[in-house]
Amino acid sequence: MISILFVAGGTGGHVIPALNMADYIAQKAPHWKISFVGRKDSFEEGLIRGKYDFYGLNISRSSDVKKLSYYLSISDAIKILNEVKPDILVVFGSYITVPVIIASIVKKYPFFLHEQNVVPGRVTKLFYEFSEGVAISFPETREYFRDKSKVYLTGNFVKTELLTMDKASCKKELGFDENRKLLLITGGSQGAMKINYEVKKIIPYLLDKGWQILHQIGEKNYVRYIEEIPIEEWIQKGYNPVPFIRNMELAICGADFAISRAGATTISQFLIAGLPAIYIPYPYAKDNHQKYNAELVVKVGGGELLLEDQLSSQKLLHLLDKWNDEKRLAEASEACKKISIATGRENFWNLLLEKLEGRN
């Protein structure tokens, strides 16, 4: 029986692709043992525990290599490896993964890295030469690695079943009019106060222009936001504000245009679905990786880049008027699809089999 250990945590951008890949492997090889390492008492533990074996590490972003707790995390990681005895690890670079990578190198356990962003993160660049290889989501990422023999273009690990459904059917299932354009607004799973604040000023105008709107507010800000708007009037015109979109793939499938952050998984989903967007990168993302993700899409005509320090309701209104055009939307949708990779999980599965067979 093959044992595979996923290492992911810190953000949904790392955890969701890991879960997507684990689910794919569980379908392809139900006899394989799948386990996860993440942070103890974290959101990823809540997502994963009960579905797959989960091992928690006591580590935070503020952990320092000079502190004893950091070395204890490496020691704990070694204990986990001794218990799980994985045939291979799949690592999604973030601070949580470093003790496990070091433990894997010390104990000589092979590992793959997966890079979701266009510009690879520090963990990926630091450790890829010790790995079996790094699977990348975009061809442009290859240029950031000196040893290109270890770099494999797979695509991101995205569930594509809903993303490629008929748009009208998705709108209908979401409760919207299938004959009207749908605007998706999301500041990520936690929402984004600045985006919400500027969007709120132009909702009446957008509704009058014929847009329907699905707006993910964020659970933390939802009650206050709802109290500040004429909710009943806007809902009647086609506005649906929600704390959290439970089925984001369905929402992406049904949308004609979006206002969004530029996380790697979000962008991969948008490209596969052919969804153009105004991208407002999260300004505090490490190494500004969301900006580089967005620039790749904008370069091919798949949307617009709007930095948060330049964000205003007037600029949003100008851009949305520009994109309220059937021909422009159709051309941008095709441009997105042309650079998408919808077979990321299948590609990595084949790579994994090849490497495992080569070791036997």
Curated annotation (Swiss-Prot):
Q: According to Swiss-Prot or TrEMBL, what is its membrane topology? A: Peripheral membrane protein
The record's annotation in Gene3D superfamilies points to: Glycogen Phosphorylase B
Q: In which pathway does it act?
A: Cell wall biogenesis; peptidoglycan biosynthesis
The residues listed in the UniProt record as binding UDP-N-acetyl-alpha-D-glucosamine, with positions renumbered to this chain, are 11-13, 117, 189, 245, 290
Q: Where does it localize?
A: Cell inner membrane
Question: What is the uppermost EC class here?
Answer: transferase
From the record, give the transmembrane residue ranges: none
List the molecular function annotations (GO) for this entry. Answer: UDP-N-acetyl-D-glucosamine:N-acetylmuramoyl-L-alanyl-D-glutamyl-meso-2,6-diaminopimelyl-D-alanyl-D-alanine-diphosphoundecaprenol 4-beta-N-acetylglucosaminlytransferase activity; undecaprenyldiphospho-muramoylpentapeptide beta-N-acetylglucosaminyltransferase activity
User: In which broad location class does this protein mainly occur, judging by the first location in its UniProt entry?
Assistant: membrane
Name assigned to this protein: UDP-N-acetylglucosamine--N-acetylmuramyl-(pentapeptide) pyrophosphoryl-undecaprenol N-acetylglucosamine transferase
Q: What is the source species?
A: Dictyoglomus thermophilum (strain ATCC 35947 / DSM 3960 / H-6-12)
Name the gene for this chain. murG
